[in-house]
Regions:
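Contiguous mid-protein beta-loop-alpha structural module that forms a pocket-lining wall or clamp
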Residues: 148
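Buried, small/hydrophobic-residue-enriched core segments of structured protein domains
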Residues: 1-143, 155-160, 164-165, 177, ...
């Protein structure tokens, strides 16, 4: 609640004088803690939450937007926009930074018309994007279309955006963690989808999966289903972790495939006894070279290389 209050103040204060904030932090905390955070944020002046349970439990107004995965699961960005507009109407908020912001804004206005509700920008130079997108929207006749910014915002970055032509913010991580606490910026990123509308085993064969990836500045993705192999040096120590875009076919005698099936059809199949897990951890540590155990910030224990054999992914 304290973090939310600071953010509301940084955004200009509660009510009509400030820019509205949407609480979007449920994916960063326990599911019921997310509901509690949404309630606390609303008390502190947030306008709404993306958590539907908070609406059901406490009557907190709900709002939201689409995810990058929604765009990536479509063949074209325009297809994703068209589907969202058909389902939610022209007052919806379209996410425009999956590939190219300028082209996405043009497509969004072309499909929705000047009555488009809002566009959301989640990456890149947010102040610069806000200025250029505002100018572009105005030139296309969408002068009432709002600009919503998201992307690891906190009270300090919100204050820094005070002079940018922005209409609102979405805040997640910094809100639900109380702001100022260390966090791991780990999120779900869609990297591949089936080339058929079915989800049977044949459709999920890696050779039939379509590689997809976000290409926005600052948050690019690396598309494709992946396999990981830990390679060993001549001395027997783990030397490299190689990420492949196809099942490994040329393994050294001591190389180890790292991926193992744990869940199949929604059922856990890979659970191991506690003693076995403890032994496996000890064996994995013994594989590492001595320098990998140094506590040095910014250096990997062992390097990760992308590519199949000599071909980079």
């Amino acid at each position: 609640a304290s973090a939310a209050s600071r953010m509301v103040t940084a955004a200009g204060g509660p009510g009509s004088d400030g820019r509205p904030l949407i609480e979007m932090g449920s994916r960063r905390t326990h599911e019921w803690a997310g509901v509690a955070a949404a309630r606390a944020a609303y008390i502190a002046g947030f306008a709404s939450t993306s958590n539907l349970q908070a609406r059901l439990s406490y009557g907190v107004p709900s709002s939201g937007t689409s995810a990058h995965a929604f765009t990536l699961v479509h063949d074209e960005e325009r297809d994703a926009f068209r589907a969202q507009l058909t389902s939610l109407g022209h007052d919806t908020t379209l996410l425009v930074d999956t590939f190219n912001v300028e082209q996405a804004v043009r497509d969004a206005v072309e499909l929705a018309g000047p009555s488009l509700g809002a566009v959301r920008i989640d990456s890149g130079d947010l102040p610069a994007h806000a200025v250029s997108v505002r100018a572009l929207l105005d030139s296309l006749g969408a002068k009432d279309t709002r600009i919503i910014l998201t992307g690891d915002l906190d009270e300090y970055s919100i204050a820094g955006l005070a002079v940018a032509p922005v209409d609102g913010y979405g805040v997640g991580t910094s809100l639900v963690t109380g702001s100022g606490a260390p966090t791991a910026a780990l999120v779900y990123k869609l990297v591949a989808r089936s080339d058929t509308p079915t989800a049977d085993d044949e459709a999920l064969d890696y050779r039939r999966l379509v590689s997809v990836a976000k290409r926005s500045v600052g948050k690019p993705g690396r598309g494709g289903r992946k396999w990981a192999v830990r390679e060993r040096s001549a001395s027997g120590d783990a030397s490299t972790e190689r990420i492949l875009l196809a099942p490994p076919t040329e393994l050294g005698p001591e190389d180890r495939v790292l991926l193992h099936e744990l869940v199949r059809g929604g059922k856990i199949i890979g659970r191991e006894p506690l003693a076995d897990a403890r032994s496996r951890h000890a064996a994995a540590l013994a594989d590492l070279p001595s320098y990998a155990l140094q506590l040095s910030r910014g250096y990997p224990a062992i390097p990760t290389v992308f590519g199949t054999n000599d071909e980079e992914a």
